[in-house]
Amino acid sequence: MQSFGQDSYLLTRPSWEEMEQPGRIFRWQGYEGGPEVIVVHPPFFNSHELTVEGVSECIERLPEGYEHTLLCLGVGDHGGGPTEAQIAWVREHREAIDGWRMEFSTLDGYVEIARQSRDRLPTVVGELQPHAIGCYSVYRPVKVALRRAEHLLAQAELLSQHDEETRQALDDGWKRVAFHHFHDTLAGSCTPTAYISVLDQLGGACAAADEALHFELRRRIVDLPDDSLQRIVMLNANDVPFHGFLEHEPWIGPWAKRWLKDCYLVDENDQPVPFQTMDPEPIAFSDRNDTVLPRIFFRADLEPGELRVVRIARGGSNGTKLGIKVEANEAISSDSGARWSMAGLAWGDGPTLPVGLSLLRDMSDTWSHGLLRFSEEAMEKVSWGDPKIIDSGPLMASAIVSGTIGESKLTAEWRVFAGEPYIELKLDVFWAERFRILKMEISTPSPSDIRLDGVMGTNLGRKNDGSELPMRDWTLLGDAASPRLAVVAPDVYGLDARPERARLTLLRSSMMAQHDPAPPLAPRAVISDQGAHTFRFRFFFGESLSVEDLDRHASAMQRPVVVTDATGGMPTIY
């Protein structure tokens, strides 16, 4: 906050019951130290009637001997101000509280007084959490849409200067994104009908950014020299390097059926590029015996902002070295030692770490008012079928397994990769629950009282005490003196942990816009988050896991390389 010129903060949440606070005014400092922010936690009176007894609350919880306090009053719902009657009441009762005098002032005026008394204020170190723990995960569509808009806009802005019209479209997109960070919109606590406009606006921001991104890519393709071979063009629209695998379905014309016989990839210098073919997304073009329109899976390395090409050549073969293994029991493993089986995740000679899914009972309101943690008891565990091997190398092996939990259906696709230490999961959930929470439970490799979580702009060490807290992109689990487990999960926004396990909160199914007390189920109640959801995970294990690598992987998942075809210079066939 200080780096953006904000040295004070008016606190309304967390409440006194949710977090221990030293008083109504204190200094707030991050774990990393540095400049402090003055935090003021005043009482708010959003009612028409004022009483001396009520407003006297503002003189409680002050540092000993502190002679100034703050009272906020008015009427309205997320806005408004004092009425004429309230103003008259304050004037009439200016000195009604013994030893104190009420004066009309401003927040800036009060904070300036606090700055002069900074040394007398207590200090709080760390995050101001938790509050309304249900909001970390409820109504997932708005959270996914907002994060997608943020990353697409960031990608579009990383490219060269845009024309005025495009620049204005991106600016308008950022305004939409900033507006929908509002604490009820992003929190998932608005009415269902309100989210129609919210998602439309965030979709518009995504569309503007996506259009700018692809128009810029097309402009760069025009500048490429002609080539007699068809090319796959890659642009890393990111501020960090990309090292990993890409998937692309090139349109290779009427000779597509020959792909498996004599097509292969080469780079700009005619050197072979390792690859494998996969089933394409359109089922109509898939034939496992003779792929009609294959999806190409290949490795790429790109610097920030770099554009590169690979070329589709003919008359050769795929000489890619096998880097994965499919075992007789349907387990899959990589040459880096990463292994998945139905029993769990393993690396080398390390322990097998189970990954499970559980349903919890959750009768709390939309915000989960009054709760600091969710139930420890699972109502039901997931029931999986038998795994089926889908891809078997040479660069990637995958297994798909379907399951059920409650009334919901799940499909999990597990992958391992040649030369990569992580295990990847794509989890599709068709959510059909009421008053339930879906948690992913992961065993930690070594018990620890502390974990490291990604948070906005940085990371924080947190106690594994079972409290529900928000997360950004990843968590790092286990004793720092032993190999640890890292989970990169950019589509998950809340978790809790104990020394021996962590539970990532995937979905809730509360009534929308329901504030306790309320009827058990209103006739027109809308249950949140029903339908299809997709989650992406990468699991790492080792002694030298760095936060920089975890952030890089999360960034690659959130800001994927842009891939397309280029045919300039190819001979015509029609």
Which residue ranges define each predicted feature?
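Short low-complexity, flexible loop/linker segments enriched in glycine and/or proline
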Residues: 23-28, 202
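Loop/turn elements at helix/coil->beta-strand transitions in domains of secreted/extracellular proteins
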Residues: 4-8, 33-36, 65-70, 97-101
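Structural recognition of the beta-strand scaffold that forms the well-ordered cores
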Residues: 8-11, 27, 37-40, 71-72, ...
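Metal- or metallocofactor-binding catalytic centers and their adjacent structured scaffolds
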Residues: 113-228
